[in-house]
Amino acid sequence: VSMADKFIVESELASFKNESFECEMDSKKLRETAQEGGFFSYVAGVASYVIDHYRVKGLRIHIDEMDLPIKSGLSSSAAICVLVARAFNEMYELQLNTMGEMNIAFYGEQRTPSRCGRLDQACAFGVMPVNMTFDGNEVFVDKIKVKKPLYWVFSELNGSKDTVKILSDLNKCYPFAETEIEKNVQKALGIENEKLIAKATKAIESGDAEQVGSLMVEAQNMFDSMVAPASPKELAAPQLHKVL
């Protein structure tokens, strides 16, 4: 990362398909790119938010390594947003802590069509388990201390999903639930989720892998029965259930 007069993101990695992004440090132009969607919408959204709130010039960001697959439900969009927020923070000495970087990343991504929630920004803490609590617009983060190692397996299902459609369908359930499906979504993602997370936090802290696995099965069953009906086409997940 280096300072520049413009905002530039470049890479020789295959995921970039020999494309790079370059734009003047103009909030309007960057917002337009963000709103259009596309590969560089996330970095443009964050840069536009930074310009609107801080006295900064441009950056040249060269990405030479990427080990997180995109469009796989692993928060790749949040990761690139956090990267841009942290780059501005460190290069221009904005004196932001991790939560500050997360806020910039979140509001920057909100300027794109994806409009993902705050949970993904937890990647800002790196390889560290955290418990995130949401209360209205407030977010509280507590680090989880693990007594013994837990080993995780991540599998690439080679599937596809439309995140924008999923979020659009789920957002219809809020703020007022009118149908039984909408009530189930609010219950599952509200009080029932809170109970599961409390149990999971204790299991992770104690290093109880078997209990963690059992709770993951319970969470998946609840999701399938109470949340998936709100977006049946996108959340059917046939490949996932075949593997499970």
Predicted regions and their residues:
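C-terminal nucleotide
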Residues: 2-44, 48-55, 108, 123-244
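Acidic, glycine-rich active-site loops and adjacent beta-strand->loop/helix elements
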Residues: 13-15, 63-70, 102-112
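Alpha-helix capping and helix-loop boundary segments enriched in small/acidic/polar residues
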Residues: 34-37, 71-76, 96, 113, ...
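Short acidic, glycine/serine/threonine-rich loops at helix termini
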Residues: 73-76, 116-118, 127, 165-168
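A structural-propensity feature for long, helix-poor, extended segments
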Residues: 110-121
